[in-house]
């Protein structure tokens, strides 16, 4: 199967065909589920697979997917601090974070599919994972400070 990678002369059918082919190859390129968290096994990986296949068809690298993942997740984190907590802001934040974590799974799947995994890519992935973990707590603290009437001692 020829790699289409969403060139301007590719038809929608060509791109869809490339995505389907990548989905089939991704099923064989999955890492073991042994020891994986349930959320990763049943949410991140299944959502990440079509995202990885689409990124493959578009010609993206795993590191590019990592950056898009970080942008989605960190935008969600920033919105926690910036928006008043409402049902709609919560839905938006949740959607961005789920998309970000699905893309975080997709970058590794894309690397396995293309055989382009690298130490630099792994470092980039771990860097953004650490940044996401650290900033979520800060965002919640800022949200509580801005939107809730709490004694300052509770915020320490």
Per-range role (PLM):
Residues 1-92:
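Topogenic membrane-insertion module of multi-pass membrane proteins
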């Amino acid at each position: 199967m020829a790699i289409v990678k969403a060139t301007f002369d590719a038809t929608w059918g060509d791109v869809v065909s490339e995505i389907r082919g990548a989905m089939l190859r991704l099923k064989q390129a999955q890492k073991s589920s042994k020891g994986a968290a349930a959320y990763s096994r049943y949410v991140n990986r299944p959502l990440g697979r079509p995202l990885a296949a689409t990124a493959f068809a578009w010609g993206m690298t795993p590191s590019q997917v990592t950056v898009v993942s970080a942008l989605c997740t960190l935008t969600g984190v920033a919105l926690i601090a910036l928006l008043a907590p409402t049902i709609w802001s919560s839905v938006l934040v949740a959607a961005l974070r789920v998309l970000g974590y699905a893309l975080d799974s997709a970058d590794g799947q894309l690397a396995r599919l293309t055989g382009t995994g690298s130490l630099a890519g792994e470092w980039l992935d771990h860097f953004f994972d650490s940044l996401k973990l650290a900033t979520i707590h800060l965002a919640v603290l800022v949200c509580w400070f801005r939107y809730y009437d709490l004694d300052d001692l509770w915020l320490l």
